[in-house]
């Protein structure tokens, strides 16, 4: 079977983020359903996030030949499916730890490699990345809403069934042959050494500290919001809709970002994100009333999207190979490592503080206001 390359790419994003829309909001619910404590759930989720960090940092850069991108996606999707199936094999904590690490290690490089494929194809034929990537966000909304509805109708066991189905669909989509194969010169790996990486961190430590705090503050939300809201009386379906609302707000801001932030610097945008973080996590710890939860979820466009846009703007202002290296550090550390570490702490804090964990997240976001890097122009 052959599929037009743009549609092939859109299908890849759709099936990946459909699966991620099941895994990210509801995996803690599945872990709780099989009898694990919040402390253990935090450890498992944290281990998974560390594996995501390592997968993105170590596996994705290994694919230096653009013509091998599709083969790499197929292999990684197959390995991800094998580990998804392995979740069915047992509920012992040691086994779950092993499977969580393997699943996330191979699941995480799929997006950067798909993005690399999109960049390669943009050089070969006209491709509107935004319109293609949008299907990933749409799929996340569908995945989280559908999972919430089915968990309400049945029970937590439907989560693993849907995840397995989603990953299998992703593999089947990747096995379809696109009309145009990726082509391009093999990218030679730069021999930068530790000194270059350390110099990069020293030069950009304020930026990295700021985004690590802002993204890391999402840990309690990613790991325990579904459990917290269900304990407050909301159905799994309602939880799915709330998560979907956050992604809808995210998509809207992505679509309007050029108009909204045209005159803002990365420093200004990081301030906006930090303020949204303090407000969002403070409200989340204070109340579970539905009107306020709607506000909390709309603020996702500030805590996540504006922070990510600020990071992209800051990185784009760097020169030469520094752009590539700083992008790698940002993706691995801010989007992976900081959330992984904070998720482990969030598990302990939720065990003993309950909703108070979200007030701690507000405190985590607060220092970002003062650590922002000095860049120009200002809005």
Swiss-Prot record:
The chain crosses the membrane at residues 5-31, 38-66, 71-96, 101-118, 130-152, 156-175, 208-227, 232-256, 267-286, 290-312, 324-351, 355-375. One of its GO terms (cellular component) is plasma membrane. InterPro entries: HcaT, HcaT-like, MFS_assoc_dom, MFS_trans_sf. It comes from the Bacteria. Keywords: Cell inner membrane, Cell membrane, Membrane, Symport, Transmembrane, Transmembrane helix, Transport. Pfam families: MFS_1_like (PF12832). It is a multi-pass membrane protein. Signal peptide: none annotated. One of its GO terms (molecular function) is lactose binding. It is found in: Cell inner membrane. Its main location: membrane. Residues 32-37, 97-100, 153-155, 228-231, 287-289, 352-354 are periplasmic. Residues 1-4, 67-70, 119-129, 176-207, 257-266, 313-323, 376-379 are cytoplasmic. Probable permease involved in the uptake of 3-phenylpropionic acid. Belongs to the major facilitator superfamily. Phenyl propionate permease (PPP) (TC 2.A.1.27) family. This is Probable 3-phenylpropionic acid transporter. It comes from Escherichia coli (strain K12).
């Amino acid at each position: 079977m052959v599929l037009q390359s743009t549609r092939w790419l859109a299908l890849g994003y759709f099936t990946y983020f459909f699966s991620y829309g099941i895994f990210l909001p509801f995996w803690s619910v599945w872990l709780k359903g099989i009898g694990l404590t919040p402390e253990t759930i935090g450890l498992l989720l944290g281990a998974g996030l560390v594996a995501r960090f390592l997968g993105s940092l170590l596996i994705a850069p290994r694919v230096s030949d653009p013509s091998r991108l599709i083969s790499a996606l197929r292999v990684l999707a197959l390995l991800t499916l094998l580990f998804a199936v392995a979740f069915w094999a047992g509920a012992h904590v040691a086994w779950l730890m092993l499977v969580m690490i393997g699943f996330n290690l191979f699941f995480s490089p799929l997006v950067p490699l798909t993005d690399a494929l999109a960049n390669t194809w943009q050089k070969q034929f006209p491709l509107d990345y935004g319109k293609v990537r949008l299907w990933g966000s749409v799929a996340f909304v569908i995945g989280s809403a559908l999972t919430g509805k089915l968990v309400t109708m049945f029970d937590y066991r439907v989560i693993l069934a849907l995840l397995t189905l989603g990953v299998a669909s992703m593999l089947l989509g990747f096995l379809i042959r696109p009309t145009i194969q990726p082509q391009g010169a093999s990218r030679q790996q730069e021999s930068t050494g530790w000194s270059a990486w350390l110099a990069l961190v020293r030069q950009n430590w304020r930026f990295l500290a700021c985004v690590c705090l802002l993204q890391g503050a999402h840990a309690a939300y990613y790991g325990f919001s579904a459990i917290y809201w269900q304990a407050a009386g909301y159905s799994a379906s309602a939880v799915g809709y709330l998560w979907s609302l956050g992604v809808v707000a995210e998509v809207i801001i992505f679509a309007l970002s050029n108009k909204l932030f045209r005159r803002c610097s990365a420093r200004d945008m990081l301030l906006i994100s930090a303020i949204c973080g303090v407000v969002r996590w403070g409200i989340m710890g204070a109340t579970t009333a539905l009107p306020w939860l709607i506000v909390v979820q709309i603020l996702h466009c500030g805590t996540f999207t504006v922070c990510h846009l600020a990071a992209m703007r800051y990185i784009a202002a760097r020169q030469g190979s520094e752009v590539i290296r700083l992008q790698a550090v940002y993706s691995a550390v801010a989007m992976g490592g900081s959330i992984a570490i904070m998720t482990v702490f969030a598990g302990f804090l939720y065990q003993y503080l309950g909703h108070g964990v979200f007030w701690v997240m507000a405190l985590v976001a607060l220092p970002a206001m003062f650590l922002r890097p000095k860049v120009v122009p200002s809005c």
